[in-house]
Amino acid sequence: MDAMRRMRILKQHLKTDRLLGVSAVPVGDAAATATMVQAEPQPGREAFSTASLPVMKRDQKIQALTQMDEQEVRGCTACVLCENRIQTVFGEGNPDASIMFIGEGPGQSEDEQGRPFVGRSGDLLDKQIQAMGFKRSDVYIANVVKCRPPNNRTPLADEVDACSGYLRRQIEIIRPKVIITLGGPAAKLVLGTAEGITRIRGTWHEYTAVNPPVPVMPTFHPAYLLRQYTKENRAKVWSDLQAAMERLGLGPRG
């Protein structure tokens, strides 16, 4: 990992720590006596633990998310995606959400409106959320990258790296009990796997960039389901969503 990326990740960790009221963080081997370092940039240090971070109240979460969006994401120029965007798409929803949906990146409609999952894919996702017994405002919806890739292509590795800290901090602040990734690219990027969506959907995985790790259920993207709207595919997605509900102790729905 190059020095610039290490420094960016470090700064992103430190910004989150300050928002959460932490002035010092333990680094190094957890089995050894923890070495405390002040929350100032220290090049080369990446082994931060979030286990001791305090749970934020709702208004604190809103403030932290709003500050990240307005002061960092909207003006971000960390990768080439900033060059052609209309606006950034930070994410939206309940800061206390038990379920967080994560897609790959904004499309044209999202870029124009500044909101995740609008248009036909968003309509289908809204219906899926309602079928689970929630409203859109009950969950949190975000993307791996916050700017639209040209022609809706899959984000490149350096683009994902540039945005990875934003997503990690969103997850740290919201602390969802379950993450549902939407589509193969999102699952690969969140989980760091090369496996295709047809092989990993329907089974539980973990997002380990935060502590404690968050259970992840990959499923098909709504756009794919619209293109391949078969009874079999709909049943697979519904099975994945039911698994998430059961994980939350909600039990299956009809």
Language-model segments: what does each one mean?
Residues 1-9:
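Charged, compositionally biased N-terminal leader segments and the immediate start
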Residues 8, 12, 16-18, 23-254:
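A polyanion-binding, active-site-adjacent surface
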